[in-house]
Amino acid sequence: MQRNNFTEVIEFVFLGFSSFGKHQITLFVVFLTIYILTLAGNIIIVTITHIDHHLHTPMYFFLSMLASSETVYTLVIVPRMLSSLIFYNLPISLAGCATQMFFFVTLATNNCFLLTAMGYDRYVAICNPLRYTIIMSKGMCALLVCGSLGTGLVMAVLHVPAMFHLPFCGTVVEHFFCDIYPVMKLSCVDTTVNEIINYGVSSFVILVPIGLIFISYVLIVSSILKIVSTEGQKKAFATCASHLTVVIVHYGCASIAYLKPKSESSVEKDLLLSVTYTIITPLLNPVVYSLRNKEVKDALCRAVGRNTS
């Protein structure tokens, strides 16, 4: 592709929440508060699952991996977004934008497949309890985690170099971070191939995990309904409730954001959706798993009691 006919763009500026005018300071305070709570919550989960031997199980291993991934995920996006709310027209270099997008795609994909691994873990625990420790061995858990991260890296390698091989004419990104579509819109040339790659990657990353999780929960519900005691059914449902809550919010927002027709896109709606899956969902994980999960709450109490004694 020839670049000689285009002025070389070396940096971008985020439009972000500039349309909110005077409310940007309020947004800064709100987002900063959520960011601090998200980091604190996820770090607490990682720490608790590491130090409390009662939580040394596959379920909490996956939870700690998800919390770690969500921590880095927010570090990649939120600090830059907060800076843009305070310092207007703060530029980001082309290399910086590519780096942010690479980590975003990698970690977003990793999170999707980690949630799938957690769904599989719940399926094995409920449908094959006698073989649970054999199936969900340390090797299998490591394989699922590495597979999730590896898939994320492959998706990023497919996506990001193809995106930044394009020549850009515009410099104003109608977003608060280097997301795929807003950056693609700045290209001077036809982006049909890139759009096909993006839609293919998005469909794979969203629909494959949704399908696998759906199958897992169909089998889980089928097994739960066979449990004779009502108490046993309640306990089984309770173990899945936290995961299912996070899955619905996570994939619901991601599906609307990346699989909707281009004709239905608008800057305001896209910003709102992006806030949900980049800021709200990472906070949802520690809140849901700590408030709804008795084992995590007990582990927190033990840790607090140990430190105060």
Swiss-Prot record:
Q: Which CDD domains match?
A: 7tmA_OR10A-like
Gene3D superfamilies on file? Rhodopsin 7-helix transmembrane proteins
Q: Top-down, what is the taxonomic lineage of the species of origin? A: Eukaryota, Metazoa, Chordata, Craniata, Vertebrata
Q: What is this protein called?
A: Olfactory receptor 10J5
Cytoplasmic face residues = 49-57, 106-131, 225-235, 292-309
Biological role stated in the UniProt entry = Olfactory receptor. Activated by the synthetic floral odorant, lyral, and by alpha-cedrene, a sesquiterpene constituent of cedarwood oil. Its activation increases intracellular Ca(2+). Acts as a key regulator of myogenesis through its actions on cell migration and adhesion by activating the Ca(2+)-dependent AKT signal transduction pathway. Also acts as a regulator of angiogenesis. Moreover, plays a role in the regulation of lipid accumulation in hepatocytes via the cAMP-PKA pathway. Involved in sperm chemotaxis and motility.
The membrane topology noted for this protein in its Swiss-Prot or TrEMBL record is: Multi-pass membrane protein
Which superkingdom? Eukaryota
As one GO molecular function, the record gives: G protein-coupled receptor activity
Q: Name one GO biological process term.
A: lipid homeostasis
A Pfam family found in this protein is 7tm_4
Q: Which residues lie on this side of the membrane: Extracellular?
A: 1-27, 79-84, 153-203, 257-270
Entry's family note:
Belongs to the G-protein coupled receptor 1 family.
Does the keyword field hold Ubl conjugation? no
Q: Which GO terms describe its cellular component?
A: endoplasmic reticulum membrane; membrane; plasma membrane
The record's listing under PROSITE patterns reads: G_PROTEIN_RECEP_F1_2 (PS50262)
User: Which coarse location class applies to the principal site listed for this UniProt protein?
Assistant: membrane
Q: In which tissues is it expressed?
A: Expressed in the olfactory epithelium as well as in the testis. Expressed in round spermatids during stages VI-VIII of spermatogenesis.
The answer to keyword 4Fe-4S applying to this record is no
**Record localization:** Cell membrane
